[in-house]
């Protein structure tokens, strides 16, 4: 119960170390790793440890004794530039590859794709 009270109630971004934190229901979610791994959701412990240490440093009253690792697959390109073009199949367009910047870039790249469709 102490952990719930001591965890922040707003989303946080620690830009220098590339860690984000937010509430997810009654849980405290901390994320900060991404790698080009193909279709692979294996979670390496060496990627989890820095996240736990970050929580322990900035939120010492939040317990890290139990945690639930999770990995999601996000289409992304090596240079983080999304793919916004027509496929080989006429009338089918790509709008993917945004990686962790999906919500940030999606509206603008949707406009780019819409412009291509209307041409």
Which residues are covered by each model-predicted region?
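C-terminal lid/capping helical subdomain adjacent to the catalytic/cofactor pocket in oxidative enzymes
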Residues: 3, 81-119
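Active-site substrate-recognition segment that forms the wall
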Residues: 1-90
């Amino acid at each position: 119960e102490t952990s719930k009270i001591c965890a922040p109630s707003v989303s946080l971004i620690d830009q220098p170390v590339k860690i984000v934190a937010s509430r997810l229901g009654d849980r405290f979610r901390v994320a900060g790793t991404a790698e080009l791994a193909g279709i692979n959701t294996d979670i390496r412990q060496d990627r989890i440890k820095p996240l736990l240490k970050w929580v322990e440093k900035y939120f010492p009253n939040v317990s890290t004794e139990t945690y639930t690792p999770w990995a999601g697959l996000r289409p992304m390109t090596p240079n983080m530039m999304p793919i916004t073009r027509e496929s080989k199949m006429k009338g089918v367009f790509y709008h993917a590859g945004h990686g962790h910047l999906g919500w940030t870039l999606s509206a603008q790249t949707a406009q780019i794709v819409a412009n291509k469709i209307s041409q």
